[in-house]
Amino acid sequence: MGKKINILFLGGSKRVSIAKAFIQAGIDVGYEVNIFSYELTNFEPIANVGTIVPGLKWQDDQILNHLKKTIVDFEINIVVPFVDIATIVCSNLKEVCENVFFCVSALEINTTMFDKKKSHSWFIDHKLCVPEIGDSLPFVAKLITGSGGKGMYFVKSQAEKNTFYSNNKATDFLMQRFVEGVEYSVDCYLDRHHKIVSIVPRKRLETTNGEATRSVTERNQQIILLSEKILKLGDFSGPVTIQFIVEKDTSGIFIIEINPRLGSAVLTSIAAGANICKYILLDYLKINIPSNQNWQENLLMVRAYQEFYFICN
């Protein structure tokens, strides 16, 4: 196979299954896909299927220059962010790298969604239903720039509230009313022309460290229509993951957050027939992607763990 596509993951150290999905999608469209991943150490699971590129921390002053050099040195065609701060880095890189496809929304959207307070204001401005701000019990405290469930506290008693305020700086957090209900992640894709290609809700049945380890696709029309509305409100493109919770007592649908990137359990939607990895390749190749609503409902994903081994003298 003579035709190649080189993909650079940003923060994709554990995304082995997604890397394999990209490789298979490449085979499907007649290309050899090579995976590279920008990491702080060489001892990451992604090394099993790709090449690790030793990198800098996201906050490093030289991050853009180093990534630009990496893109040139490894002849990168597509850049895919897997952590929130990397979406901002990608948006900035997009301005200085030609002939490279970046799977990101606009810088303004990425910057807004990275900050919990800014995103809350964005939701309010666009008249979306969000949990009220406040620390009346019970409440959830979210680190303003936290992601993947990091820096999140569920505070349900006065004792827990006292402990939270004793151990944390309140201004670093967004406090919201705790909403008990069913959580949904919605895997969306918009092509390079901002056309919505697919919207797949999946119910989060079990989570570990903020990531779904058991989820099932559900053709929930209310959530699909609400997601479509949201995607038309901002300058979104590429993969977008929207988080909702449906309140147990009222059936009200609250938006929790938007991650303008691939979600950690996007493989559920890919296996269901909404192959976002293939969409990304087609977008890079400037091939039209037809809208896809023909995905498998009630597909259950159960995540397992796999060990990887390295010789580290």
Functional labels for PLM-detected ranges:
Residues 1-102:
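ATP-binding N-terminal substructure of ATP-dependent carboxylate-amine bond-forming enzymes
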Residues 30-32, 172, 237-241:
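Short secondary-structure junction motifs
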Residues 74, 219-313:
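ATP-dependent carboxylate activation and anion-phosphoryl transfer catalytic cores
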Residues 46-47, 62-65, 110-117, 209-210:
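Short, charged, surface-exposed secondary-structure boundary motifs
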Residues 107-180, 191-195, 221-224:
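Active-site nucleotide/adenylate-binding loops and adjacent lid/helix of ATP-dependent enzymes
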Residues 87-88, 148, 263, 267:
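Short glycine-rich, flexible loops that bind phosphorylated cofactors or substrates
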Residues 156-235, 245-254:
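Phosphate-binding site of ATP-dependent enzymes
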